[in-house]
Structures are given as structure tokens and as C-alpha cells.
Amino acid sequence: IRDRIRDHRPIIGIVHVPVSETTYFGSHENGAWVLRGNDAPRRIHVRQPASDPAVIVGSRSHANPELGSQLEQLGPHQLVSMGSSLKFCRLAEGKADFYPRLGPTCEWDTAAAQGVVEAAGGQVVKNDGSPLDYNNKDSYLNPHFFVFGDPQRLWLRPFQGNNNNQ
């Protein structure tokens, strides 16, 4: 696969989960899909509007008291802990609503999963609301970022102005 990043943005993504024999894939031209085992591929979309209470995915290893208080500002929610790229895929599949990432990641950790979630109608943005982008700085480290499906919710409000740019 050539040219997975165009204009500093992923345009295609593939995430495979060997333990469950599940593959998530998507592109801007063809939307997002999930393939489980030998089943036929199924089209997936982010959930809009977000569920109530919202399902927020995160990592236990990156939890801290400040994050807890920020999440409380979002209102009633269920926090589910899981592995890295799976968080993006749960959003792409419409099984989660928000993923705040305030810990270190590298571009290779996120580009494929971002391609899937954006193909499913989701957004991956930095603290200022601009899209997470690639290959345009000296470091391969990502700034803090947020993944969500429902753009009507004010997901970023509790995190803005708190120096969450890494």
C-alpha cells in the first residue's frame, strides 16, 4: 500500500487484532469496515449522537486524578479500559464515544487507526481542535489528542486551557 499519508493526513488504515481474528479497515473513498473471522465484511460508522451515558475508552496506565475530574465535567459516562489501537476501532464501530489520549504516542502508533476512525465518520484532533497530522515536524511524537464520533458534543471543553499539548 503506497501513499497512506497524503497532505499530512492518513487516507487509509488497517488494524488487525489477532486474538479475536478481527480486522478493521477503511479509506476516505470507501468508508470503514470490520471483518471477523470468515464472516463477510460489515460496514461500520461512529455513533452519532453519542450514547447517554457516554462510553469513554482509556488506559488504566495513563489514568490520573486530573483526567478523572476532566471526564466528570463531560457528565455521566462509563469508562472502559483497553489496548491502544482498539480504542480507535471501538469508536469506528460505534461501540464507544470518546477517547482522550494525554500520554505519549508516536505517529506509527496512531496513523492506521486514525485512517479507520476517520473513514467511519469520526474525528481525531489535537487540543486546539485541528486534525492530528503526520510527517511535518522534527519529532515523531504525537501531541495529546482526542478521538470522537459525535461533533455536537463539547468533548474538548474540559481539556482546553490545561496545557494538554504535551
PLM-predicted stretches and their roles:
Residues 2-89, 138-166:
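Acidic beta-strand-loop-alpha-helix segment within the catalytic core
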Residues 56, 90-92, 111-118:
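Hydrophobic residues within well-ordered alpha-helices
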Residues 122-137:
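Acidic, metal-binding active-site segment of PIN/NYN-like and related structure-specific nucleases
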Residues 76, 101-102:
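A generic structural signal for short
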Residues 108:
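Acidic donor-binding loop at a coil-to-helix junction in glycosyltransferase catalytic cores
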Residues 60, 103-105, 127-130:
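Short secondary-structure boundary segments
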Residues 84, 102-103:
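Beta->alpha turn/N-cap motifs
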Residues 93-98, 122-123:
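Alpha-to-beta junction loops
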